[in-house]
């Protein structure tokens, strides 16, 4: 099995890391590098009142935000500008994969990838409507230069007493390595962190079940669980239910265990949001043991 080497980094707006695949088996070998990112797009709604339950009325010209074409275009520009800065010296064409959340529909992603700041990357869109009460979904953008799409499935979280986002599992080939990307936006902390924790634990259990079902069919497939998890790496949903480890060595060579590179990022005082003068790192990318090699990045 080809291994992918990961180096972790955190952005204020996204969780992201880079992966590299050896081009040959020699020492001092050259590698191919691709970036993987997650970005909560924070209520990316169009201006059209097209939800039959009126869940999008807030983001319409007549709604409380007076969400008109100018504001929508400005938001698209700002998001595209931020994404355009996801490039590095080794990934000049941007990330291979960008998981996203808080989007109203597919059309807003089509509008986003058409923005001049990132249109040259030729990003493709993967999206599926969810039953979420606010009318927001998850999605995925990918660059066909790096990633070849094979299959997409959607998984409903039925173990909670409300409508929330589906989990989307995107399977394909990244730098020749077969991978599955499970894009998430887990239930919020409304009602309190402790009181709402069972909802996120249920979401984590669903992600774990999806991964296990993939491995029953293909034991060598690499799995990435990414998203706005509304929990930190050390919280029960991530550390206990998923069993995502802080240190690669704690996997003890288990190809189907999970490693969370963002745990150490949070330990360094870096987060993706702050609340009551304390950083949280809800936006994470968690990877399976068969996508790791060597020591902690």
What are these regions (language model features)?
Residues 7-16:
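Bacterial N-terminal signal peptides
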Residues 19-116, 126-138:
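N-terminal, active-site-proximal structural segment of metallo-dependent hydrolase catalytic domains
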